[in-house]
């Protein structure tokens, strides 16, 4: 199924939703680099192709979220540290105190009160 391009005026409204920030990680976005994420996947969950179902996203967040619902995305992010534990480089840098793990709940940029 070929997707229709999202018109520029709609892309601009999506970009402005969170003042030029990724809805998920909160990084600043350039309009030209912003990806439009479907909050509810059109492909799997019959999500709508309209602005209410769009979030501005950076390439990394949009790629990793893929077609996941928000809560599944949050759960997958929460598993990243344990997945990293399997790599030698991660264990070595942790052993030498070069990185530090911080356990905290995953709160997306769009969920923080001052960004709404």
Where are these regions (language model features)?
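Glycine-/proline-rich flexible loop or hinge segments
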Residues: 38, 54-57
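Immediate flanking context of iron-sulfur cluster ligation sites
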Residues: 12-16, 45-53
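Histidine-centered catalytic micro-motifs used for acid/base chemistry in nuclease
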Residues: 35-41
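Alpha-solenoid HEAT/Armadillo repeat architecture
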Residues: 44, 62-63
